[in-house]
């Protein structure tokens, strides 16, 4: 059941209500409806369903995830389903990013500082290159895809085409490469660089880690080869190739000169406005900064903070939305939004947060008003670019359901036959002793327990209480750093302890098949963590275990509780009837080694530079002069992880580096 474009490889066929969901989604999409929702319960194989839909439709697809970790997991799964097709990964390429900001109260200006991850930048370029050269493309992206990404037409036009047998002056080829931001280095060949030795020109494109070798005979291209950068082995001989720019932002010379004139005019107008309002310091600041930037732009075509002039460099009108990743897709592209109930609110919030920061910079003379157009898309601008979309969630939001109208397609039957958890509501009187008994039962069966509380204090108290009674327990809260969170979750799966307590264990994508019991304390206290959607998601953490149960400790039945229980019971009944009809006995889930937690985040086995860990743990007591040395060592580890495409590991190091830099900055203040 696949188109000629995509080749779906799966060790299983659609089962349960997957065939119906796949057929319904395809029918809806072929009927050219803009919005449809896949309401898929935990463990029902939503990713496989979407892979089947993509394969059948045969259209370039953008899969949007609400964080880098889930994007990485989805990308990995889809690459397994589509090994012969282009499954690309597009997330923010910053290892460290401190946006430019100004705090008027303390008169503190914070300059933009950023560290770009070279490997992720390569993957971003690989994504846009694939979109230009083929149709069998799936790009898995985070929300960063709604930020400006140059102009696709200019990017494509600037590519340097080469063909075997054609004639090119090597000097002109080199000039063209320099014009699209490649640099010459005859000693060390890295991504975005080239070298010329005799009649051989070697380039490492922005989207490759392999070398393209161009062999000239006079002005004729005699051979084009793809070379292994380490061994020098010829991997492939090519007939033709296009070398795409080293950066997505490509500005033709004539556009650059026009942009400089427009920047000059706006600066003069804004300086006059500030002076008229007696804001002389701001006027002087703006004039000085902008004149310096203009000088740099005219001399070298670049300046720090060049993105703030993107309205003019991209030749856009005031208020016109920037072109972003979605503009690199052909017209018939498909959008899939994973965990849409989380991703869509995130999509709405990006623009407002960005504009609030920019307004302060503009008002105080740090930036021209046009800097406000260096921004992410507004939600309505994004939807105008979308032709068709599938929302995917176990608990879709009201907005998604309204937009989908009658096209909400359910997928609640698990191929494994595992039922949704049994739910019990028990009074809060004696709840701790009751829970202790339940935990003992689970421990004897070598199963795991999740307990969610409303306060950090209660989580700590419960942890102490159970620990004193011999239960192997740990707790999770917001102050625990990323690396520790991951290590704790891994240790739970490995059986190093049996009970995990936390304030917010509501983690979409949290995949813990060993958990057979979820206990929700204060389930009747209405609020975000005890809303219907949150309760369903939390109860669902036990939905991968054949003996899954959830206990809600409450003295009242809230509306949210009633709805969550009713929905879970409804799904449980559907699965039960299906199992009886088809003679299915629920089977435990045997997750592959590269499951959702471990496939990108196998921290304890890959990070163990134990000494570095111990030094970092004591960083608060380190003399300030030692901090830069520690930062340097962490940066080396970060780059090493990035080279192995262990991007979440690299991100953990990035967060540590940022924490240490913040300490240094705080001291300077």
Swiss-Prot record:
Residues annotated as domain Helicase ATP-binding: 27-414
Top-rank lineage group of the source organism: Bacteria
Subcellular location as annotated: Cytoplasm
Motif Beta-hairpin: positions: 93-116
Keyword Protein biosynthesis: no
Residue ranges occupied by any Helicase C-terminal domain in the UniProt entry: 431-597
A GO-annotated cellular component: excinuclease repair complex
UniProt-recorded Gene Ontology molecular function terms: ATP binding; ATP hydrolysis activity; DNA binding; excinuclease ABC activity
A biological process from GO: SOS response
Domain named UVR: residues: 628-663
Binding site for ATP: 40-47
PANTHER family from the UniProt entry: UVRABC SYSTEM PROTEIN B
Free-text note on domains in this protein's UniProt record: The beta-hairpin motif is involved in DNA binding.
Description of how the protein assembles with itself and partners: Forms a heterotetramer with UvrA during the search for lesions. Interacts with UvrC in an incision complex.
Family to which this protein belongs: Belongs to the UvrB family.
NCBIfam families: PRK05298.1, uvrb
Role noted for this protein: The UvrABC repair system catalyzes the recognition and processing of DNA lesions. A damage recognition complex composed of 2 UvrA and 2 UvrB subunits scans DNA for abnormalities. Upon binding of the UvrA(2)B(2) complex to a putative damaged site, the DNA wraps around one UvrB monomer. DNA wrap is dependent on ATP binding by UvrB and probably causes local melting of the DNA helix, facilitating insertion of UvrB beta-hairpin between the DNA strands. Then UvrB probes one DNA strand for the presence of a lesion.
More info: This bacteria is considerably more resistant to UV and gamma irradiation than E.coli; the E.coli-like SOS regulon model is not an appropriate model for DNA repair in this cyanobacterium.
Protein's UniProt name: UvrABC system protein B
Species of the source: Synechocystis sp. (strain ATCC 27184 / PCC 6803 / Kazusa)
Lineage: Bacteria, Bacillati, Cyanobacteriota, Cyanophyceae, Synechococcales
């Amino acid at each position: 059941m696949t188109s000629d474009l995509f080749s779906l490889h799966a060790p299983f066929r659609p089962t349960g209500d997957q065939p119906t969901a796949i057929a319904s989604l395809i029918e809806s999409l072929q009927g050219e409806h803009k919005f449809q929702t896949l309401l898929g319960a935990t463990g029902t194989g939503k990713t496989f369903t979407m892979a089947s839909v993509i394969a059948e439709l045969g259209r370039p697809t953008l899969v949007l995830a609400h964080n880098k970790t889930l994007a990485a997991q989805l990308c990995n799964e889809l690459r397994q389903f589509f090994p012969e097709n282009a499954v690309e990964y597009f997330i923010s390429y910053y290892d460290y990013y401190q946006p430019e900001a100004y705090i008027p109260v303390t008169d503190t200006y914070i300059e933009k500082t950023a560290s770009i991850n070279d490997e992720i930048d390569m993957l971003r370029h690989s994504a846009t290159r694939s979109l230009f050269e083929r149709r069998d493309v799936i790009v898995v992206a985070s929300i960063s895809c709604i930020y400006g990404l140059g102009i696709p037409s200019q990017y494509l036009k600037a590519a340097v085409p080469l063909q075997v047998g054609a004639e090119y002056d090597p000097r002109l080829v080199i000039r063209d490469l320099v014009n699209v931001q490649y640099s010459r280095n005859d000693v060390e060949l890295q991504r975005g660089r080239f070298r010329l030795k005799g009649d051989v020109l070697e380039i490492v494109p922005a989207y490759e880690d392999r070398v393209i070798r161009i062999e000239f005979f006079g002005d004729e291209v005699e051979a084009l080869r793809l070379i292994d950068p380490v061994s020098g082995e010829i991997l492939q001989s090519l007939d033709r190739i296009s070398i795409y720019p080293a950066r997505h932002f490509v500005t033709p010379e004539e556009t650059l000169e026009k942009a400089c004139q427009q920047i000059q005019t706006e600066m003069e107008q804004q300086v006059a406005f500030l002076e008229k309002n007696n804001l002389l310091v701001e006027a002087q600041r703006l004039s000085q900064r902008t004149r310096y930037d203009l000088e740099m732009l005219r001399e070298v075509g670049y300046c720090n903070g060049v993105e703030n002039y993107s309205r003019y460099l991209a030749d856009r009108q005031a208020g016109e939305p920037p072109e972003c990743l979605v503009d690199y897709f052909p017209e018939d592209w498909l959008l899939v939004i994973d965990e849409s109930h989380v991703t869509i609110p995130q999509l709405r919030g990006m623009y407002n947060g960005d504009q609030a920061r920019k307004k302060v910079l503009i008002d105080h003379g740090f930036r021209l008003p046009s800097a406000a157009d260096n921004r992410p898309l507004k939600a309505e601008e994004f939807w105008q670019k979308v032709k068709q979309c599938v929302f995917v969630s176990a608990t879709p939001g009201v907005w998604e359901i309204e937009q989908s109208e009658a096209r909400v397609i359910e997928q609640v039957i698990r191929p494994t036959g595992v039922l949704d958890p049994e739910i019990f509501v028990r009074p809060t009187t004696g709840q701790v002793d009751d829970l202790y008994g339940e935990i003992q039962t689970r421990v004897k069966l070598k199963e795991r327990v999740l307990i969610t509380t409303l306060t950090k204090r209660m989580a700590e108290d419960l942890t102490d209480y159970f620990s004193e009674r011999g239960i192997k327990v740990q707790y999770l809260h917001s102050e625990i750093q990323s690396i520790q969170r991951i290590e704790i979750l891994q240790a739970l799966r490995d059986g190093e302890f049996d009970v995990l307590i936390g304030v917010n264990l509501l983690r979409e994508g949290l995949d813990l098949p060993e958990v057979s019991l979820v206990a929700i304390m204060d389930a009747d206290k209405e609020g975000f963590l005890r809303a219907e959607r949150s309760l369903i998601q939390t109860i669902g953490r036990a939905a991968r275990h054949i003996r899954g149960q959830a206990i809600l400790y409450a003295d009242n039945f809230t509306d949210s509780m009633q709805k969550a229980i009713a929905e879970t019971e409804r799904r449980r009944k559907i699965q039960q009837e299906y199992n009886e009809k088809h003679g299915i006995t629920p089977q435990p889930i045997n997750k592959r080694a590269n499951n959702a937690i471990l496939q990108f985040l196998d921290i304890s086995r890959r990070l163990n530079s134990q000494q570095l860990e111990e030094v970092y743990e004591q960083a608060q007591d380190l003399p300030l002069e030692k901090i830069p040395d520690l930062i340097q060592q962490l940066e080396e580890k970060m780059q090493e992880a990035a080279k192995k495409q262990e991007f979440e590991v690299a991100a953990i190091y990035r967060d540590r580096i940022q924490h240490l830099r913040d300490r240094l900055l705080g001291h300077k203040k």
